Amino acid sequence: ALAICAGASRPEVRSVAAFAPPADFEDWSNDPEHLLGHARSVGVIRDPDFPKDFDAWAEELDHVKAIDSAAEFAPRSLTILHGGDDDVVPVFDSRMVADAHGAADLRIIQGAGHLLRYDPRAIAVLLGWVDRQRFSHNV
């Protein structure tokens, strides 16, 4: 979700691939302490002093909306991968983000959960996407 939001605000970003993006962070923004604890437990946030200003950080969660950013990111290339058995972010969220973009390549990896970075099928799809981006942009 963050990559989609960042890409939408940066015109030099030509393409984005995202794993299981939530359409928005509304559920998390209702309980930011839980999000912070979860992010620390899975190693996403490792700095014990983060965030410096918890209230400001928690307020920013209301503005993280991949569904809105996907529409802004179009017509640039967006690929979304989602595990068919994801129990953290519903597959429906990725479908909504893809629909908001209008031309996103949505790949549902059957039998995969939320941790797609450990699924060789998802990594193979991602590497194929990277190759296509390289060659389509002559990088």
Q: What kind of feature is each model-predicted range?
A:
Residues 2, 6-7, 21, 97, ...:
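Hydrophobic residues on the short alpha-helix immediately C-terminal to a glycine-rich phosphate/catalytic loop
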Residues 112-123:
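Catalytic histidine-centered segment of alpha/beta-hydrolase-like enzymes
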Residues 5-57:
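Hydrolase active-site cap/lid region
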Residues 52-70:
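Active-site nucleophile elbow and catalytic-triad environment of alpha/beta-hydrolase enzymes
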Residues 120, 132-139:
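Alpha/beta-hydrolase-fold serine-hydrolase catalytic core, especially in secreted/extracellular enzymes
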Residues 73-74, 79-82, 86:
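Short beta-strand/loop motif that positions the catalytic acidic residue
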Residues 84-86, 110-113:
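Acidic beta-to-alpha connecting loop that harbors the catalytic carboxylate
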Residues 87-93, 117-118:
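Conserved alpha/beta-hydrolase "acid-adjacent" motif
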